[in-house]
A protein has these predicted regions:
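Short, structured coil segments at secondary-structure junctions
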Residues: 4-5, 15, 67, 90
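Short, charged/polar "capping" segments at the starts of alpha-helices
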Residues: 6, 27-31, 79
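A conserved nucleotide-sugar
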Residues: 12-24
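Hydrophobic beta-strand scaffold residues
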Residues: 19-20, 71, 94
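Donor nucleotide-activated moiety binding/catalytic core segment of transferases
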Residues: 24-25, 29-56, 61
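A donor-sugar binding/catalytic signature common to diverse glycosyltransferases
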Residues: 46-86
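Leloir-type glycosyltransferase catalytic cores
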Residues: 88-139
Length: 139
């Protein structure tokens, strides 16, 4: 994912973008700021403050959506199903990175945030209904 992010950062340097990497890997690259010990607040703030998010993390994918950020998500093998299912459930297939060798991904995709909010509300109502049915079943 770094290659994709680095290429996008380089292409968008005129916009003053920098690349922040949160994870365990060290990059010897002046254009990449690394953060190895990001706690929950740092992680969420990085996404909230970002103009764009490039991730292979399920949670970063979800929070990019919650915070209404333009993003691209690469589904790695260990979490890939969750990421792909999430993108499908929210009609966000355009935000999917399929090939890490490509560096021409764009953040020009049109995301219908009203539709996303509607889907979130429907899923929330379905979850509440399920929880209530379980709680009432125990009475």
């Amino acid at each position: 994912v770094r290659l994709v992010g680095s290429e996008m950062c380089i292409r968008d340097r005129s916009r003053g973008l920098k690349l922040l990497y949160i994870g365990d890997f060290d990059y010897d690259d002046a254009d990449i700021e690394s953060c190895h010990d990001a706690g929950v607040e740092d992680f969420l703030n990085a996404i909230y403050s970002a103009r764009y998010v490039i991730t292979n993390s399920f949670h970063a994918t979800v929070f990019s959506t919650i915070f209404k950020k333009k993003f691209c998500s690469y589904a790695v093998s260990r979490t890939g199903t969750r990421v792909l299912d999430f993108l499908d459930d929210f009609n966000l297939q355009e935000c999917r990175i399929d090939d890490l060798n490509r560096t021409d991904y764009s953040f020009n995709q049109k995301i219908d945030w009203d539709e996303i909010s509607s889907i979130i509300n429907r899923k929330k109502q379905g979850s509440l209904k399920y929880i209530r049915s379980i709680v009432n079943q125990d009475k």
